[in-house]
């Protein structure tokens, strides 16, 4: 892990009056960049020439850093450009996937918003389970081997995959049949199969809950809630059951979009309790803990119990559902507030209070 002192040494050389908020042009970059502009920051997007259209059309980026391929963002040349811009990078799922977690931890020497040490805890299932389980949250039962499957399960794989390759099954035989099908299609590799995560299939309504932890205010804030629109499962459910059987298609769970939802108000105490518990445990296990945006992906059972099956320890794709604010983020100051603007507000306040070390790593 890059020492905090080294990152702070880099930041000390910055012109504090000309800070740039930067991120990779993908995932949740639109509201990250727009939110930064609303708070008076200059913005920069890292992109390829064939994917720069949204950032030009929406006018959210002041500066463009072009790369031949997104994996180039970890190069020393790109890092130097960012440092020359006095950049603070806001990570999201695509940034981590393209830069590479090892590079984020060891070679990407540009100040980042949040705790870069916690990103591995969302990427590796065992660490994620340790953090979520240690927080006292209700989790699906975990199966250590395909041979243990004795009922409906969901099979997942590590990293920011957007649901690609996930599948349900009910037996060991079905597990291997679907694994071999996905391998034949090039969706899964042998390495993916070795890292398969098998968990109880919980029947319930899906709620992806977006929080923001402010180290400056020591407060967990509920920012919004979304559900995912997944292909091909959400298309298959529109097909009559008799035709589904004839089609004989194994559904996929690739996230193609999100839509906002609100949760039953009587469940909000449970929602806040979950966020509080996770932040408390994160501070114990991976100091300084969960800084800034994070997400708990959950299922609400018919008994009104929220079961957490996954977390994001950075800006999550569902934040895109409230670029102009959510019903929950509106309640704090009676004004629209996106996750991107909330991040920018925290950086701005940290600079004003001369406490930037609290929010970057």
Curated annotation (Swiss-Prot):
Which pathway does it take part in? Purine metabolism; IMP biosynthesis via de novo pathway; 5-formamido-1-(5-phospho-D-ribosyl)imidazole-4-carboxamide from 5-amino-1-(5-phospho-D-ribosyl)imidazole-4-carboxamide (formate route): step 1/1
How is the cofactor bound, as the UniProt entry phrases it? Binds 1 Mg(2+) or Mn(2+) ion per subunit.
Reactions accelerated catalytically: 5-amino-1-(5-phospho-beta-D-ribosyl)imidazole-4-carboxamide + formate + ATP = 5-formamido-1-(5-phospho-D-ribosyl)imidazole-4-carboxamide + ADP + phosphate
User: Where on this chain does Mg(2+) bind?
Assistant: 297, 310
Which part of the chain is the ATP-grasp domain? 116-348
Q: Could you say which enzyme class this protein belongs to?
A: ligase
The GO biological-process annotations, alphabetized, read as: 'de novo' IMP biosynthetic process
Enzyme Commission no: 6.3.4.23
Q: What is the required cofactor set for this protein?
A: Mg(2+); Mn(2+)
Do the record's keywords include Transferase? no
Q: Which GO terms describe its molecular function?
A: ATP binding; ligase activity, forming carbon-nitrogen bonds; magnesium ion binding
Q: Looking at the keywords, is Amino-acid biosynthesis present? A: no
Keywords in alphabetical order: ATP-binding, Ligase, Magnesium, Manganese, Metal-binding, Nucleotide-binding, Purine biosynthesis
Q: PROSITE patterns from the xrefs?
A: ATP_GRASP (PS50975)
- Which positions does UniProt annotate for 5-amino-1-(5-phospho-beta-D-ribosyl)imidazole-4-carboxamide binding? 27, 94, 258
- Coiled-coil regions listed in the entry: none
HAMAP family under this entry? IMP_biosynth_PurP
UniProt record similarity statement: Belongs to the phosphohexose mutase family.
Q: What does this protein do?
A: Catalyzes the ATP- and formate-dependent formylation of 5-aminoimidazole-4-carboxamide-1-beta-d-ribofuranosyl 5'-monophosphate (AICAR) to 5-formaminoimidazole-4-carboxamide-1-beta-d-ribofuranosyl 5'-monophosphate (FAICAR) in the absence of folates.
Q: What is this protein called?
A: 5-formaminoimidazole-4-carboxamide-1-(beta)-D-ribofuranosyl 5'-monophosphate synthetase
Origin organism is: Methanococcus vannielii (strain ATCC 35089 / DSM 1224 / JCM 13029 / OCM 148 / SB)
Recite the lineage of the species.
Archaea, Methanobacteriati, Methanobacteriota, Methanomada group, Methanococci
């Amino acid at each position: 892990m890059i020492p905090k002192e080294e990152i702070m040494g880099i930041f000390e050389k910055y012109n504090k009056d000309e800070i740039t908020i930067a991120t990779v042009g993908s995932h949740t970059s639109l509201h990250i960049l727009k939110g930064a502009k609303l708070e008076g920051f200059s913005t920069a997007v890292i992109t390829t020439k064939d994917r720069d259209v949204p950032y030009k059309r929406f006018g959210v980026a002041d500066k463009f850093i072009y790369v031949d391929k997104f994996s180039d963002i970890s190069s020393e040349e790109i890092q130097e450009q960012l440092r020359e811009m006095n950049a603070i990078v806001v990570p999201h799922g695509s940034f981590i996937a393209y830069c590479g977690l090892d590079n984020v931890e060891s070679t990407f020497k540009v100040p980042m918003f949040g705790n870069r040490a916690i990103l591995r805890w969302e990427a590796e299932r065992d660490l994620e389970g340790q953090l979520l389980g240690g927080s006292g949250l209700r989790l699906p039962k975990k199966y250590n081997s395909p041979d243990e499957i004795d009922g409906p399960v969901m099979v997942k794989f590590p990293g920011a995959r957007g649901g690609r390759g996930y599948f349900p099954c009910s037996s060991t035989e079905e597990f291997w049949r679907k694994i071999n099908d996905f391998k034949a299609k090039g969706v899964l590799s042998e390495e993916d199969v070795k890292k398969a995560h098998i968990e109880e299939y919980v029947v319930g309504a899906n709620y992806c809950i977006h929080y923001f932890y402010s180290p400056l205010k020591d407060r967990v804030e509920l920012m919004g809630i979304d559900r995912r629109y997944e292909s091909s499962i959400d298309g298959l459910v529109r097909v009559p059951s008799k035709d589904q059987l004839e089609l004989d298609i194994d559904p996929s769970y690739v996230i193609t979009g999100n839509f906002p939802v609100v949760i039953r108000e009587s469940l909000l105490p449970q929602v806040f309790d979950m966020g509080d518990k996770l932040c408390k445990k994160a501070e114990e296990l991976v100091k300084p803990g969960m800084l800034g945006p994070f997400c708990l992906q959950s299922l609400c059972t018919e008994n009104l119990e929220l079961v957490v099956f996954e977390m994001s320890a950075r800006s999550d794709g569902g934040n895109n559902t409230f670029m102009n604010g959510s019903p929950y983020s509106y309640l704090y100051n009676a004004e629209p507030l996106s996750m991107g603007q909330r991040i920018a507000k925290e950086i701005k306040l940290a600079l004003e209070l001369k406490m930037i070390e609290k929010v970057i790593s």
